[in-house]
């Protein structure tokens, strides 16, 4: 289970929320290979595929911080079948390395992450939120649908130079991350706990707040120096 302090937008009070009976399932396969292409060239490959999901509906209890009254007690949250948002379900990467004379070398790599989803929130999938707030089918789906993130691609490169002192080694590396400079790549996301109130004349409607996203770093450069002895 889990506990947290929240602002319950539907009740209009700060509350403590406890979620119990969370069930998760994770399974997958992975494979990797290192290939020696030539005396100074090598290629590393790796891929994985998995299924990470919630396997049952947890129970949500919300207690008001104002007077310790129960806002919602052991409400069923329809999260069964939702996907965990912490990891992509498909990944692949390849790295080409060159080790030149006098300690020079470089690496170039490409990565892919797919079947990614935002982290679902139990509160908005309870009947109090999804059915009371989602008075139309479209709005109900907005509260309960889990958003899928776009596939992500990365391209990186590094140039390095090693200096040897007996059994010791000093290595200076210049690393270039996100060579394509794609600043719109979403790294992760999670659903908001908040609910928007929308007034239209005398009618009051509810809608979920927008998903919170974390974006990958834009094109970046790093200079590192390491010493092994």
Predicted regions span which residues?
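C-terminal beta-signal and adjacent terminal beta-strands/loops
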Residues: 112-130, 161-229
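C-terminal beta-barrel architecture of Gram-negative outer-membrane proteins
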Residues: 85-164, 188-189
């Amino acid at each position: 289970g889990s506990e947290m302090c929240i602002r319950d937008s539907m009740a209009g009070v700060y509350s403590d929320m406890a979620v119990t009976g969370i069930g998760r399932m994770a399974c997958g396969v992975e494979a990797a290979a290192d290939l020696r292409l030539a005396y100074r060239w090598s290629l590393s490959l790796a891929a994985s595929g998995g299924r990470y999901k919630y396997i049952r509906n947890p129970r949500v209890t919300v207690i008001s911080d104002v007077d310790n009254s129960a806002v919602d007690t052991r409400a069923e949250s329809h999260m069964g079948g939702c996907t965990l948002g912490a990891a992509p379900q498909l990944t692949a990467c390849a790295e080409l390395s060159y080790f030149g004379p006098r300690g020079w070398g470089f690496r170039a790599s490409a990565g892919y992450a797919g079947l990614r989803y935002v982290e679902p929130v139990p509160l908005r999938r309870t009947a109090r939120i999804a059915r009371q707030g989602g008075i139309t089918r479209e709005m109900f789906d907005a509260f309960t649908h889990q958003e899928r993130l776009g596939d992500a691609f990365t391209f990186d490169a590094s140039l390095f130079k090693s200096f040897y002192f007996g059994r010791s080694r000093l290595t200076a590396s210049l690393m270039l991350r996100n060579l394509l400079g794609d600043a719109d790549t979403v790294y992760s996301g999670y659903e908001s706990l908040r609910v928007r109130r929308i007034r239209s004349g005398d009618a009051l409607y509810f809608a979920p707040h927008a998903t919170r996203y974390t974006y990958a770093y834009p094109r970046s450069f790093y200079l590192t120096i390491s010493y092994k002895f």
